[in-house]
Amino acid sequence: MRLIIVSGRSGSGKSTALDVLEDSGFYCIDNLPAGVLPQLAENALINTELLQPKVAVSIDARNLPSHLMRFPELLEEARARHIQCDVLYLDADEEVLLKRFSETRRRHPLTNANRSLAEAIRVESDLLGPIADLADLKIDTTNLNLYQLRDSIKLRLLNQPEPGTAFLVESFGFKRGMPVDADLVFDVRCLPNPYWKPELREHSGLDQPVIDYLAAQPDVEDMYNDISSYLLKWLPRFAASNRAYVTIAIGCTGGHHRSVYITERLGRQLQQTLKNVQVRHRDL
């Protein structure tokens, strides 16, 4: 049986995540009281009507604070039943959350006459801290639209051909912010930039003219070899430590040329030695 626990601050995309999981065959429960998590796992195991026992639940700040504090204990009880439990935590920058609530005109569940929206968001962070600390996968939705979030959830949670650590190699541009859910970040902004070549500016690191240009640069080759050697040595250690998800982020200025080129090469090389390696270009 597989149980996915979805949590995160209000406005970060939990409802979208549940919709994606429901469309993928999961039995979904919104706003589950955290205290009944072990019983839910037990009941799902013995329910013979679940031909494909896949369950997803959301747990949010509307829970009793005492239950949220006990989340580590409750999760351990569920996992003791030999269930694959994945904790997905969604979040976004506070300014983005404020903007989303302003645009939708929805009420935050923790606001009241004496607590502003900004204060409610900060209180929510504290309440959900025990869940965030135990998240197997964190997705920062700050720069994601609805469709990108759906694709990200499918890529990270559902497209794992084999069990074991799921690795994501992701390119990004620093001008749009560094991905907060990255475990390892490599900055390649010191490399020659195709952007300053007029004939290459409109191409990306996926296009042959940019590939040929970067492949001919000695510094690019040195950087690639150093990053590759580091990852080939240490990523198997991450897998051996029972990490469920590892994100490797490669950043350049705009996320179109250098980081894309390096990410594509790294992805192909890592796929030769590791299982469950996926490649994503955040800013293309």
UniProtKB/Swiss-Prot annotation:
Assigned keywords, A-Z: ATP-binding, GTP-binding, Nucleotide-binding
Keyword Translocase included in the entry's annotation: no
InterPro entries: P-loop_NTPase (IPR027417), RapZ-like (IPR005337), RapZ-like_N (IPR053930), RapZ_C (IPR053931)
Entry-linked Gene3D superfamilies: P-loop containing nucleotide triphosphate hydrolases
One Pfam family, short name: PapZ_C
Single annotated GO MF: GTP binding
Keyword Nucleotide-binding: yes
Annotated residues for binding of GTP: D60, A61, R62, N63
Binding site for ATP: G8, R9, S10, G11, S12, G13, K14, S15
Entry's family note: Belongs to the RapZ-like family.
Protein function: Displays ATPase and GTPase activities.
UniProt protein name: Nucleotide-binding protein in ptsO 5'region
